[in-house]
């Protein structure tokens, strides 16, 4: 059984027991979270597609950890002008473990 849900403006395909990295959620580590924006649920040959969301579909998960991603560098450069601007960014994330999928 797997499902496709929406969180943080992105779509994720998950199955039970899977750990997935999402955009930062304001929920403490170890607490349960429930996603209700389910786009599709598939259980073998039985497939439910939402318009836009599946009625009564829920994904239960547990927050495993919070952290920051790898640093990326942003460089702005103007040729021949002795102008260079450099900036770094590290995006916050939340790791969640999927504990249950229900239709």
Swiss-Prot record:
It comes from the Bacteria. InterPro entries: bL21-like (IPR028909), bL21-like_sf (IPR036164), Ribosomal_bL21 (IPR001787), Ribosomal_bL21_CS (IPR018258). GO terms for cellular component: cytoplasm; ribonucleoprotein complex; ribosome. One of its GO terms (biological process) is translation. GO terms for molecular function: rRNA binding; structural constituent of ribosome. Keywords: Ribonucleoprotein, Ribosomal protein, RNA-binding, rRNA-binding. Belongs to the bacterial ribosomal protein bL21 family. Part of the 50S ribosomal subunit. Contacts protein L20. HAMAP family: Ribosomal_bL21 (MF_01363). This protein binds to 23S rRNA in the presence of protein L20. This is Large ribosomal subunit protein bL21. It comes from Serratia proteamaculans (strain 568). The gene is rplU.
